[in-house]
Amino acid sequence: MPSAPRKQSKTYKVPRRPFESARLDAELKLAGEYGLRNKHEIWRVALTLSKIRRAARELLTLDEKDPKRLFEGNAIIRRLVRLGILDESRMKLDYVLALRIEDFLERRLQTQVFKLGLAKSIHHARVLIFQRHIRVGKQIVNVPSFVVRLDAQKHIDFALSSPYGGGRPGRCKRKRLRSQQEGGEGEEAEEE
């Protein structure tokens, strides 16, 4: 246990109304499109988005030349641009309020692996990440919800230890190669 006890807070917020058909349909569509395992993954992103939008809304109430608005507003915008959520052409607090859940889900490692063509489907991308076949830079990442920064996006590739990345072949392939080699040796012995 750490020396200083920490207050653990929830990473998601459940919807106020549990059976709202429009919301349920929208969540199901998002879960299918981005290959999410459960609604908690959507709610977690929704909480992050709501915190950022709340901060932006609070800053927009201040005067435009207010030092707090300038400093904190630039920090929020810079962070969102670095993550690739906000475009560089839209670097204003008004655009932060227009962000959607999809903008955050697009930056997940699972989505990026699928979009780069390393996986056949969004679900295959999730499996590849879990099985430690994907690296970002030199680091193997096995968390599908890892948020990929804009500068790290070009460094997504197969891990060097993975059979997909030129590493040791998988168990089935090794077995097949061994049987082919033994079969080839058996034929040579018969010819002599």
Swiss-Prot record:
Q: What else is known?
A: There are 2 genes for uS4 in S.pombe.
Q: Enumerate the UniProt keywords alphabetically.
A: Cytoplasm, Phosphoprotein, Ribonucleoprotein, Ribosomal protein, RNA-binding, rRNA-binding
Subcellular location(s) per record: Cytoplasm
Q: How does it assemble?
A: Component of the small ribosomal subunit (SSU). Mature yeast ribosomes consist of a small (40S) and a large (60S) subunit. The 40S small subunit contains 1 molecule of ribosomal RNA (18S rRNA) and at least 33 different proteins. The large 60S subunit contains 3 rRNA molecules (25S, 5.8S and 5S rRNA) and at least 46 different proteins. Interacts with snoRNA U3. uS11 interacts with MPP10. Component of the ribosomal small subunit (SSU) processome composed of at least 40 protein subunits and snoRNA U3.
UniProt lists the family membership as follows: Belongs to the universal ribosomal protein uS4 family.
Region Disordered: list its residue ranges: 166-192
Task: Report the main location listed first in the record.
Answer: cytoplasm
Sorted alphabetically, the Gene Ontology BP terms of this entry are: cytoplasmic translation; ribosomal small subunit biogenesis
Which positions carry Phosphoserine? S89, S179
What residue stretches are annotated with the S4 RNA-binding domain? 107-181
Matching entries from Pfam families are given as: Ribosomal_S4, S4
Q: Which Gene3D superfamilies match?
A: RNA-binding S4 domain
Q: Which GO terms describe its molecular function?
A: rRNA binding; structural constituent of ribosome
The highest taxon in the source lineage is: Eukaryota
Q: Which SMART domains match?
A: Ribosomal_S4 (SM01390), S4 (SM00363)
* InterPro entries, alphabetized: Ribosomal_uS4 (IPR022801), Ribosomal_uS4_CS (IPR018079), Ribosomal_uS4_euk/arc (IPR005710), Ribosomal_uS4_N (IPR001912), S4_RNA-bd (IPR002942), S4_RNA-bd_sf (IPR036986)
What is the purpose of this protein?
A: Component of the ribosome, a large ribonucleoprotein complex responsible for the synthesis of proteins in the cell. The small ribosomal subunit (SSU) binds messenger RNAs (mRNAs) and translates the encoded message by selecting cognate aminoacyl-transfer RNA (tRNA) molecules. The large subunit (LSU) contains the ribosomal catalytic site termed the peptidyl transferase center (PTC), which catalyzes the formation of peptide bonds, thereby polymerizing the amino acids delivered by tRNAs into a polypeptide chain.
Recorded GO CC terms: cytosol; cytosolic small ribosomal subunit
Protein name per its UniProtKB record: Small ribosomal subunit protein uS4B
**CDD domains in the record, alphabetically?**
S4
